Amino acid sequence: VYSIIRYTRFKMILIVDSGSTKTDWCFADSSDVYVLVHTDGINPVVQSYDEMLSVVQKQMLPRAKQQSLDLASLDEVYFYGAGCTPELRLAVEKALRVAVDEKPSVYVDSDLLAAARALCGTDSGIACILGTGSNSCYYDGEGIKEHTPALGYILGDEGSGAVLGRNFINGILKGTLSRELRDVFFDEYHTSQADIINKVYHSAMPNRFLASLSKFILPHIDDESLEALVVRNFENFIISNIRNYSEAKPVINAVGSVAFLYRKQLEQAAMLQGYELGKILKSPLEGLLDYHFANK
């Protein structure tokens, strides 16, 4: 008597969460079995095809090999990234194809859709990104239905780390934050007004410098004037962005380091503006794993 044993092969997928500074490559065959590989960022807005290809070939592939990952076994690739507008997605897909060949299906979408899928799954809701920059949308369970343009840290990006840093520097230099806080800041950072102005107006990426000031803000959040500034930054985000989503339930879901670290202040701002706080994630990867394996 012979028995037939059928082996069920798990679907192998690659989920990529990419920003301008770093990229997380998550190789998974289930939502709780995965391997992470980290590389520099991939952003088609600021990088050429050759630069993106270099990250794939010189960083991702060798590090995947070190982890004994077999890219030939991949069934699907989901790349979510900053700057992945419809007109720029083809260049990203082309760079990925060099690594994974023609077998797997490759999908390239925006970081905002990643946030929406991670936070809301197949339900409708408000999805936000609150990190160095900010973004938001109303998601109907399948796609982005409404979107308020973020506009960057000069014209917009309310609620972001960059705008928080900008408002903090404004308060320190103009004296609207407490004198005690000002003294502690200059003592810890060994800087001056002239140095700060130079970094903001003459450095290559001032938004990153401004966002980095969160390292000072968070440990000193007990200062009343500083906490009020953080809450006000989130309120401005809600007023300028979230109120536009007339169909959405008054529940704010957010992903990103600023949302995660300042959850208490975000919840306070939401309450002041008539909203509740929903799901908060530091990174979208956990939610994306659940989303893609629940919908396989």
Can you name each region flagged by the protein language model?
Residues P44-V45, G83, A150-D157, Y275-K279:
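A short glycine/serine-rich beta->alpha loop
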Residues C26, Y78-Y80, Y107, A127:
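Short, conserved beta-strand segments within well-ordered enzyme catalytic domains
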Residues Y78-T85, L130-G133, P250-A259:
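Glycine-rich beta-strand-to-loop/alpha-helix junction loops that act as flexible
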Residues E76, S105-Y107, V251:
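Proline-centered loop/turn at the N-terminus of a beta-strand
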Residues L71-A72, F79-G83, L90:
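Metal-dependent C-N hydrolase catalytic cores
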Residues Y2-L74, V98, L119-C120, S124-I126, ...:
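ATP-binding/phosphotransfer module of carbohydrate and carboxylate kinases, centering on a glycine-rich
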Residues T85-E180:
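Phosphate-binding/catalytic loop of phosphoryl-transfer enzymes
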